[in-house]
Amino acid sequence: EFERAIDLPGIVGGVVPGNAFLTRPDAEAYRPLLAAANAHKAMLFIHWGPTPGDTWPRTPPGTDNFARRMGTIDMQQSLSADMVTLCMTDILDEYPDAMIHIHNLGGNIPYEIERMDHRCLLDTPDEPLPSTCMNKPGLYMDCNSFGAQAIEMGVKLYGADKILFGTDGTEFGADWSNKAVAEADIGEAARNAILHGNAARVLSHLATFAPLSEAAE
C-alpha cells in the first residue's frame, strides 16, 4: 500500500502508530515499511496510537481527568519511549534515506534529558550520554500544541533544523502554535526554519512548496 500511495501527487510518506516503536523489539515488525521509506526517500510520521491487538485506550474511560491523563500524560510518555528506541538503538541505521517524523517534540525528552544524563552517569557510565544521541540524522520533531518555553527547550536539545511546524495541527488549528513560535526566544533564523524552511528543505523532492509569505496567507 505504501508503494502504491507514495506515487500519488502530494504524498510524502505514511503514518505509523506510536506503539510500533515503544521498544526495539516492537519496531522490528516495521522494518519493511522503514525499507520502503528509505527506498523512496520518504517520510514516516510516528503518531501516538495502538498497533493491532493492543489494549486501547490504556487510560480507562471514566478515570478522573481522563482527557489530561490520556491526551497528554499517556501520549507524552509513549512518545518519549519512541524517542529512546529511535535515538538510542540501531533500528534506523540501515535506513539512512528514510525520514522519520514524530509529533509533540518527541514527548518529554527535552525536559527529561538532564535527568537521563545524570542517571546514565550513575548507572551506566560506560554508555553514551542520552543527550549526545538525540540529534539523529533524518529524525524530525513537530512542535504543534506546545508553548514558547517547550519550543525553546526543543531547539536547545535537537537544533532548530530538526523542528517542523503544523504537521500535526489540523484538529487544533494554528493560532496557538503561531503564537508560541512567535514568542519563543530562538531568533529569527530559527523561527523561519521552523515555520517553513525545514519542511521545504527535507520534503521538496516529494512535494511542491509555496514561498513562506504565500503559505502564511
Model regions and ranges:
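Aromatic-anchored helix/helix-loop segment that forms the rim or "lid"
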Residues: 75-81, 124-152
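Aromatic-lined glycan-binding groove of carbohydrate-active enzymes
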Residues: 87-132
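Active-site gating/metal-coordination segments in enzymes
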Residues: 1-82
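Mid-to-C-terminal alpha-helical segments outside catalytic/metal-binding sites
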Residues: 4, 89-90, 98, 141, ...
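Hydrophobic faces of well-ordered beta-strands that scaffold small-molecule active sites
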Residues: 14-16, 44-46, 100-102, 139-143, ...
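Histidine/acidic-residue-rich catalytic or RNA/ligand-binding cores of hydrolases
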Residues: 54-63, 106-121, 151-158, 169-183, ...
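Active-site beta-loop-alpha junctions enriched in small/polar residues
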Residues: 17-21, 47-53, 105-107, 144-146, ...
